[in-house]
A protein has these predicted regions:
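N-terminal cap/lid segment of alpha/beta-hydrolase-fold proteins
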Residues: 25-65, 424, 428-430
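N-terminal signal peptide c-region/cleavage motif recognized by signal peptidases
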Residues: 13-14
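Accessory cap/linker subdomain of secreted extracellular hydrolases
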Residues: 86, 94, 161-254
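Cap/lid segment of the alpha/beta-hydrolase catalytic domain
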Residues: 61-136, 455, 461-463, 522
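Alpha/beta-hydrolase fold nucleophile elbow
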Residues: 139-150
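C-terminal, loop-rich substrate-recognition/catalytic regions characterized by aromatic stacking residues
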Residues: 287, 296-297, 301-549
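Glycine-rich nucleophile elbow surrounding the catalytic serine of serine-hydrolase chemistry
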Residues: 149-158
Length: 549
């Protein structure tokens, strides 16, 4: 299995900063787990509730030696995930860090009533107390770093918004700063069908802590007899204060702590990297590779990256005051994707790494492609026309609808395209590279009061296979505001500007570009319940067009 280490030896090219490929191939097999000590402890909160913690210790612990501490703070039952934790943390232990793994209140072995939902005030209040406690122990240097993937990436960002004095740096992996539009509940402002992840999480939280799994009256009261958080989310169907509270979006000025953000092209949380790079004034770095929802060192698809090498350099700079040179290097490592077939069993994605000094990249230019009445896609607008589409609420299954969040590798898009309005370019005579968030501009109408629109960009290979490159959905009732949605007036035309999700792709010579539009992506997102027909303006100044960055 290929494992790559990011190296600081870079050289410039006309397309940005590129790494020496020979150095990128350094194998990390010499880093092997060793025997490290694990101890358990309680961390008492100000209200008397105790949180359960595991401490993973470096080998060279002596009585008077102090270490910086890395915190992973999760609701995922630490006692039953020690195999995962030991393998993950060993790299940090070998490099002179203690790692603390703490169960959130009311989860795993921690005491208290289960937190009411993700990233609640009580979770984050407790997090501040945990950081303070870790910083004051005799074996602590007083400098804490925080890291995590998914939930642990989210609350790392949120703790950075609170700026506890001992927290010196964080790393957020596969997480987002925009809870309403990009978490697993209302992707693109539309309810995720079933929210199955949240229901499974509620069930996990109801289980007593290991190893006793004690089922008594206290367990009934504090774990089992608690309202499932999925009901809380079902009542928060519009953007607003509930989501703002723990979203960095719109509150970037609160983050004073240096952050390193890692995303994946096949993960649903990748948009946040761009916003953090562009808006946070504290030091920021970012990396995005060809990965689904995994840490990059054991990710699928490959190539994998030993991200912990970068993490140690990052934390060494901020927690040990070692000049690792990491701040003198480019801010943004990007894996540029070449074509691959629409095969969900692919083990490796073809492409290459590029290092960029900043975001947005100044040399990027937008290229506008217009839909034409003959269903072609061209660089010039055509004559005005209107195309009609009969609504099918079940549409989406054919194109990989079960993928929860515009992640993973969807199957061939041809079956879904047959139920959509599609617009194809001529065969490309030169490669065409995009990097960023394409924007689809539409003028539409519907015969019902509620409708969604889905826009997909795909690559048509010479053999006819259609690979999805970028996509997004839009809730038509949010055309003016996601905070104050209003029904569509049947038959009335209005404009939509849809930001597709962050993507990178090189359309190869001999391939074609496809833009497809329809009104559902089931069973990823809940469809609207009304039979209808939708129309889209083609051609002229306001017809369907897509801006490719």
């Amino acid at each position: 299995m290929k494992k790559l280490i990011l190296i600081s030896a870079l050289f410039f090219s006309s397309n940005g900063l590129t790494v020496d490929e020979d150095l990128m191939q350094k194998n990390n097999d010499e880093i092997r787990p060793q025997k490290f000590k694990i101890t358990t402890t309680w961390i008492t909160m100000s209200d008397g509730v105790r949180l359960a913690a595991d401490l993973y210790w470096p080998k060279d612990v002596i009585d008077d030696k102090k270490f910086p501490i890395l915190l992973e703070y999760l609701p995922y039952r630490k006692d039953e995930s020690r195999a995962r934790n030991y393998a993950l943390y060993s790299y940090f232990l070998e490099n002179g860090y203690i790692v603390a793994r703490v169960d959130i209140r009311g989860t795993g072995n921690s005491e208290g009533i289960t937190v009411p939902h993700e990233y609640s005030d009580i979770e984050l209040d407790d997090g501040e107390e945990v950081i303070e406690w870790l910083s004051k122990q005799d074996w602590s240097t007083g400098k804490i770093g925080m890291f995590g993937i998914s939930w642990g990436g989210f609350n790392s960002i949120q703790m950075a918004m609170r700026n506890p004095p001992a927290l010196k740096a964080f790393i957020s992996v596969m997480a987002t700063d925009y809870l309403y539009q990009e978490d697993v509940h209302y992707m693109d402002g539309i309810m995720v069908a079933g929210d199955s992840w949240m229901m499974r999480h509620d069930l996990d939280n109801s289980i007593p802590g290991a190893p006793e799994f004690k089922m008594d009256d206290e367990w009934i009261e504090k774990r089992f007899d608690v309202k499932p958080s999925v009901f809380t989310y079902m009542r928060q169907q519009r953007d607003g204060a509930f989501w703002d509270r723990a979203s960095a979006k719109g509150q970037y000025h609160k983050i004073k702590i240096p952050g390193y953000h890692i995303g994946g092209w096949y993960d649903g949380y990748r948009n946040s990297l761009l916003r953090m790079l562009e808006n946070v004034e504290a030091p920021v770095k970012a990396m995005i590779g060809p990965w689904d929802h995994y840490f990059p060192h054991n990710a699928w698809p490959e190539p994998q990256v030993e991200w912990r090498y970068e993490a140690v350099r990052w934390f060494d700079h901020w927690l040990k005051e070692i000049n690792t040179g990491i701040l003198e290097e480019p801010k943004f490592a990007v894996f540029v994707r070449n074509y691959h077939p629409p095969d969900s069993s692919l083990k490796e994605i073809d492409g290459f790494w590029r290092w960029e000094d900043d975001w947005p990249i100044k040399r990027i230019e937008n290229h506008i492609w217009h839909a034409h009445s003959d269903h072609s896609l061209a660089k010039n607008p055509g004559t005005e026309d209107r195309h009609h589409l009969e609504y099918r609420a079940s549409s989406g299954v054919e194109g990989g609808g079960p993928t929860m969040w515009w992640g993973s590798i969807p199957p061939d898009q041809k079956p879904m395209d047959e139920l959509s309005l599609v617009y194809d370019s001529e065969v490309l005579d030169t490669p065409f590279e995009i990097l960023g968030r394409p924007v689809a501009r539409l003028r539409v109408s519907a015969t019902a009061k509620r409708a969604n629109w889905v826009v997909r960009i795909s690559d048509i290979a010479p053999d006819g296979q259609v690979t999805q490159v970028a996509a997004a959905a839009f809730n038509g009732t949010h055309r003016n505001s996601a905070r104050n949605p209003d029904d569509i007036i049947p038959g009335e035309e209005f404009n939509l500007n849809i930001d597709l999700h962050f993507t990178s792709w090189v359309f190869q010579k001999g391939h074609r570009i496809r833009v497809a539009v329809n009104n559902a992506i089931w069973p990823m997102l809940w469809p609207t319940p009304f039979p209808m027909e939708t129309k889209i303006l083609i051609g002229g100044d306001h017809g369907l067009k897509v801006e490719f960055p």
